[in-house]
Amino acid sequence: MREIISIHIGQAGIQVGNACWELYCLEHGIQQDGTMPSDTTVGVAHDAFNTFFSETGAGKHVPRAIFVDLEPTVIDEVRTGAYRQLFHPEQLISGKEDAANNFARGHYTVGKEIVDLCLGRVRQLADNCTGLQGFLVFNAVGGGTGSGLGSLLLERLSVDYGKKSKLGFTIYPSPQVSTAVVEPYNSVLSTHSLLEHTDVAVLLDNEAIYDICRRSLDIERPTYTNLNRLISQIISSLTTSLRFDGAINVDVTEFQTNLVPYPRIHFMLSSYAPVISAEKAYHEQLSVPEITNAVFEPSSMMAKCDPRHGKYMACCLMYRGDVVPKDVNAAVVTIKTKRTVQFVDXCPTGFKCGINYQPPSVVPGGDLAKVQRAVCMISNNTAVAEVFSRIDHKFDLMYAKRAFVHWYVGEGMEEGEFSEAREDLAXLEKXYEEVGAEGADDEVTRG
């Protein structure tokens, strides 16, 4: 088996995790208590969904996941929520005091006390796998736990499981909406780790997803639940081929191979189509070319940046539902002839496609309509640098005055780490710029 372990860190990671596991259970017909009426081979772990769920002798399906937070309130919601019987209590790890939006607390002081416990639980999950393929790590980098403890866990996973892939689903601060003054610090310090210790990181930001909910689903005031359900559709589409047997499967390591031209250039944009409410879906049949065009629209991007300002290095299109390869090829040819979608000279073809015949499921009573076919795109575009330059600019404004720095130093950080992380990001922005500007003949070396 090629098992995947999911690690959900901090409030954002846990709440996105809840939405994902709710959706996986629906897709596989797993009940809230972990039983699966349709599973005829009870206790036999050769079904495709066993990549994400382990099976007990009694036929209970347990997610291969851990949830970690430095304070208990968010995890307590899982402990008392609808899916409380799905998880083993040891998979839900919470501390007593939170990271107070401080990277240094999550990484050095409070986080240090809990990290060994987390790694012990991960080790138990890993020992239960026959061929562990890698980790999915969910966190936000604006807060203290997601950024600090998230980085610490990634660093330790690199030591313990060097060769295993690590995919991050990372929620970045939004351009306009802020939940903490020190978000730029936490993000820059955390990205410094993501650069080193993840193989692929998919960037998400709440503001972009708010706009999609408002525009496409007519939700006037989207809640985190609305956002997370949309995010979970993307993550589900990415992992469909690991959980179901499909036509053209895409493996986690294949993402890496196809999307990452240079090790550090691994921050991805994602988009999903159709995002459509039940009222509208009733009147529209969305064809493969239509949904394929939709995922290339700037307004479909799940992070606030405009792909037209950059060039694509590669993109993965994951179709699911009623889709045949012939339609996909035709749609891709049409996109290639469009002048709005530009590729860097070095990768003129740049498309990797996957098809899975399992149609998308939706949460009953949710906002998304049940559709026959959907597509999710993960793309590597140089415009992603916009996300970093925005955060770097805010970082610089605060750091020039050394504002709030004492909170970090007081928790055992050194001031040098700020400038080191900031320089690392400056180099990353430059690297993106070079890839976008590259001609066919000038070789640029990238560290």
From Swiss-Prot:
Residue numbers binding Mg(2+): 71
Keyword Repeat assigned: no
Gene Ontology biological process: microtubule-based process
Subcellular location: Cytoplasm, Cytoskeleton
Positions of GTP binding: 11, 71, 144-145, 179, 206, 228
Secretion signal span: none
The enzyme's E.C. designation: 3.6.5.-
Active site positions, chain numbering: 254
InterPro entries reported for this sequence: Alpha_tubulin, Beta-tubulin_BS, Tub_FtsZ_C, Tubulin, Tubulin/FtsZ-like_C, Tubulin/FtsZ_2-layer-sand-dom, Tubulin/FtsZ_GTPase_sf, Tubulin_C
Gene3D superfamilies registered for this protein in UniProt: Helix hairpin bin (1.10.287.600), Tubulin/FtsZ, C-terminal domain (3.30.1330.20), Tubulin/FtsZ, GTPase domain (3.40.50.1440)
Annotated transmembrane regions: none
An example Gene Ontology CC term for this record: microtubule
Keywords of the record: Cytoplasm, Cytoskeleton, GTP-binding, Hydrolase, Magnesium, Metal-binding, Microtubule, Nucleotide-binding
Catalysed reaction equations from the record: GTP + H2O = GDP + phosphate + H(+)
Entry annotated with the keyword Cell wall biogenesis/degradation: no
Cofactor: Mg(2+)
Main location as per UniProt: cytoplasm
Subunit structure: Dimer of alpha and beta chains. A typical microtubule is a hollow water-filled tube with an outer diameter of 25 nm and an inner diameter of 15 nM. Alpha-beta heterodimers associate head-to-tail to form protofilaments running lengthwise along the microtubule wall with the beta-tubulin subunit facing the microtubule plus end conferring a structural polarity. Microtubules usually have 13 protofilaments but different protofilament numbers can be found in some organisms and specialized cells.
Described purpose of this protein according to its UniProt entry: Tubulin is the major constituent of microtubules, a cylinder consisting of laterally associated linear protofilaments composed of alpha- and beta-tubulin heterodimers. Microtubules grow by the addition of GTP-tubulin dimers to the microtubule end, where a stabilizing cap forms. Below the cap, tubulin dimers are in GDP-bound state, owing to GTPase activity of alpha-tubulin.
Similarity comment: family membership: Belongs to the tubulin family.
Protein name from the UniProt record: Tubulin alpha chain
UniProt organism field: Avena sativa (Oat)
Taxonomic classification: Eukaryota, Viridiplantae, Streptophyta, Embryophyta, Tracheophyta
Gene that encodes it: TUBA
